[in-house]
UniProtKB/Swiss-Prot annotation:
One of its GO terms (molecular function) is olfactory receptor activity. It is found in: Cell membrane. This is Olfactory receptor 4F15. The chain crosses the membrane at residues 26-49, 58-79, 101-120, 140-158, 196-219, 236-258, 270-289. Gene3D superfamilies: Rhodopsin 7-helix transmembrane proteins. GO terms for cellular component: plasma membrane. Residues 1-25, 80-100, 159-195, 259-269 are extracellular. It comes from Homo sapiens. PANTHER family: OLFACTORY RECEPTOR. Keywords: Cell membrane, Disulfide bond, G-protein coupled receptor, Glycoprotein, Membrane, Olfaction, Receptor, Sensory transduction, Transducer, Transmembrane, Transmembrane helix. It is a multi-pass membrane protein. SUPFAM superfamilies: Family A G protein-coupled receptor-like. Disulfide bonds join C97-C189. Residues 50-57, 121-139, 220-235, 290-312 are cytoplasmic.
């Protein structure tokens, strides 16, 4: 393709979620509140883990990085959606659209691998506690973090390298509030069936494969605990429950999107809202309300801050 082809379309237009003024107002309030709550909740986790020495362990290091990814992920689409809700002309440049897609897939892929790392951390803590600190060393934690970032970048670049040179000569309308790869491919002025199949296989395989791997690891952990100590099964279930809930919230919409034969545009929008606002909001709620150490650390940090303000 020559470079002049895709320069015909300089921007893409979003249709948004609704044209009703009343529903737009509700969406604006809902989106703003959940985005603010998501950012604050995840910031609290990062701040608590950083400031409290009792939480300087592999588990909480990975959790803090998961919170950072969640903040970045919900910031890809949420701010623009909030700003565009009342606009009649909701547009994004070609470069802006590609950037949005790139970071969505890069951060999504990174989070998938990080969740696998967190499952491995729980396996070592529950099934091999004597070797936990030896294997889950600071170097290993950094290795997990670097590996997840590299895999996320590769996953995103592999798909976008074929997209940037596609010809886009119109139409330029997205029946959505954000840029996603399948819709972008359908707007290209050429046959993209093979590319669409490659994208679906790429994203579908990494989503379903990661989820299956996580489920197998959780089953293996529970089986190992049950085999050695029936009394420890309840404790293992309690420990894993937060991780399993987060995994289901993250992978559920993704797998539904990539395995459902023909999802409607309305369904796509609802799943996107869930990913952009609900999941990043629920993750810190799950990890704080279901984790005694985190709650104790937060209370301890609040006491220190209150004492510090009194001194001032």
């Amino acid at each position: 393709m020559n470079g002049m082809n895709h320069s015909v379309v300089s921007e893409f237009v979003f249709m948004g979620l609704t044209n009703s003024r009343e529903i737009q107002l509700l969406l604006f309030v809902f989106s703003l509140l959940f985005y603010f709550a998501s950012m604050m909740g995840n910031l609290v986790i990062v701040f608590t883990v950083t400031m409290d020495a009792h939480l300087h362990s592999p588990m909480y290091f990975l959790l803090a990085n998961l919170s950072i990814i969640d903040m970045a992920f919900c910031s890809i689409t949420a701010p623009k959606m909030i700003c565009d809700i009342f606009k009649k002309h909701k547009a994004i440049s070609f470069r802006g659209c590609i950037t949005q897609i790139f970071f969505s897939h890069a951060l999504g892929g990174t989070e998938m691998v990080l969740l696998i790392a967190m499952a491995f951390d729980r396996y070592m803590a529950i099934c091999k506690p004597l070797h936990y600190l030896t294997i889950m060393s600071p170097r290993m934690c950094l290795y997990f973090l670097a590996t997840s970032s590299i895999i996320g970048l590769i996953h995103s670049l592999v798909q976008l390298v074929f997209v940037v040179d596609l010809p886009f000569c119109g139409p330029n309308i997205f029946d959505s509030f954000y840029c996603d790869l399948p819709r972008l491919l359908r707007l290209a002025c050429t046959n993209t069936q093979e590319l669409e199949f490659m994208v679906t296989v790429n994203s579908g395989l990494i989503s379903v494969g990661s989820f299956v791997l996580l489920v197998i690891s959780y089953i293996f952990i529970l089986f190992t605990v049950w085999k050695h100590s029936s009394g420890g099964l309840a404790k293992a279930l309690s420990t894993l429950s937060a991780h399993v809930t987060v995994v289901i919230l993250f992978f559920g919409p993704l797998m539904f999107f990539y395995t459902w034969p023909s999802p409607t545009s309305h369904l796509d929008k609802y799943l996107a809202i869930f990913d952009a606002f609900i999941t990043p909001f629920l993750n810190p709620v799950i990890y704080t309300f279901r984790n005694k150490d985190m709650k104790v650390a937060m209370r301890r940090l609040c006491s220190r801050l209150a004492h510090f303000t009194k001194i001032l």
